Design a protein with these regions (language model features):
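Peripheral, non-catalytic segments flanking oxidoreductase cores
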Residues: 1-194
Length: 195
């Protein structure tokens, strides 16, 4: 278990800014419009998940957030493409899906380079993880934490949790809130720098 900050990654400022613009535009749509993008039967693997719907493992109260999932854009494996749900197209925002796909692919490529560095550190072949992650079941989750107008009872923005993925890449947050539990059992702020 670990947490690091990375500089010189593949996600450029222009793409990051475009993603924030598109995602903000989506979350500013009415609840009625956003509800058209809730995909039943997929356990929130693609599309929109509304405010308060998801809760952390062991919690009964929904987190105070809403989010959108972009998933894998399968390349060169038609059988696998049939197994993954399609990404959801947002009709109201003409650039939303293209920007989401570009960001997804840049983050996935960044993750590949990080795993190659880990493989080298572990004295494995540099490309050891490549075959395990190619067309993997990755998710790009864009999260919106709406303003809280009154203090909620027992609810949290996002309850303490551990990620279940091989690695998790987080873009620098626009606000404070993310904390990481260190080996001494203390919660410390994870503050992202500009790059």
């Amino acid at each position: 278990i670990g947490f690091i900050a990375i500089k010189g990654h593949l996600l450029d400022d222009k793409t990051k800014d475009e993603l924030y613009t598109e995602v903000k535009s989506f979350f500013n749509l009415s609840d009625e419009v956003k509800s058209n993008y809730i995909i039943k039967g997929l356990a929130s693997q693609r599309g929109f998940t509304p405010f308060g719907k998801e809760s952390a493992k062991g919690k009964n109260i929904g987190d105070l957030k809403e989010f959108w999932h972009f998933g894998q854009y399968v390349k060169d494996e038609p059988k696998l493409k049939e197994e993954y749900p399609d990404n959801v197209i947002v009709n109201e925002l003409k650039n939303f899906n293209a920007v989401g796909q570009k960001t997804y692919e840049l983050l996935e490529e960044t993750g590949k380079h990080i795993l190659r560095a880990i493989a080298c550190y572990l004295n494995l072949e540099e490309t050891y993880f490549d075959k395990h992650i190619f067309n993997g079941n990755s998710i790009l989750r864009a999260i919106h934490y709406p303003p809280i107008t009154e203090e909620p009872k027992n609810a949290e923005r996002a309850a303490a949790h551990g990620d279940i993925n091989l690695i998790t890449l987080l873009m620098g947050a626009q606000g404070k809130g993310l904390q990481v539990l260190n080996n001494s059992g203390e919660w410390i702020d994870a503050v992202a720098e500009e790059d």
